[in-house]
Amino acid sequence: MTSSVVAWRIGYVGVSTLCVMMILWIWFAPGSCSPISRAMDDARFRRASEALVPANLVLKYRDHLAVCVAHVLPASAWCAIAPFQIHPSARKRFPRAHRIAGRVFFALSASMTYGYVLIHRRDLHFHATDFPTLARDERASLWIPYRRLGLSFVHVEHAGAAWFAYTATRAFAAAASSTRNFAAHRAWTWRHLAAGLGIALQRVFIWVHHLCFDLARGSGYSRGVAELQKPIFGDSLVYGGAVAALYCEWCVSFLTPATKWKSS
């Protein structure tokens, strides 16, 4: 088995696993926008969740229907479609379904991007609303000096949202143009998936951070401590995005050089 086959297979399993995780996250636990299940209403689950992040960070979208409809719930459909879209056999066996699902997929991407705009307009960023005992840009990272660099963490979030939208545009254009370039379409679709699923990996890194603090400083050291929860949340977003992007580029590197960055 070649390195490229191994890379793509691991990538596919990773994408599928993270997609399932996010579907469960959105609809069941914590399910803040879900009409069928709200795990945060369970006292035991809420205590466990609050040890990692403040309750408001998880629940704040519950009172913002437009954000739920435009951003959160479409993300679950986006995750449901993604594994089918990137499965080689599915693409070959069901080309019409692949084309139709692809149009829906990129429409969902556009909706999610608009949902991020709503989040920004309503100032629902975690560093703005979820840690009232800390200043907006205080303790945004355990080690990155955003303020000394003249930056706010919102710039990181804007960059991530812009890249998500840009990769979707490139992926769609590569397949929809008259001179279709399916290798470029594949590369940009994977970059788009990495841009979106960095959010799922963030959840993993949050847990890893707290586990590391447990091992280094004693059980529960960082649990429920805003001064640690906030930078852990911010750094985990950066790490999740970086790991997803780097692994994606490794996979894309196995495509022919002439098609990796072309859009048509």
Where are the regions that the model predicts?
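Alpha-helical membrane insertion/targeting regions
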Residues: 1-264
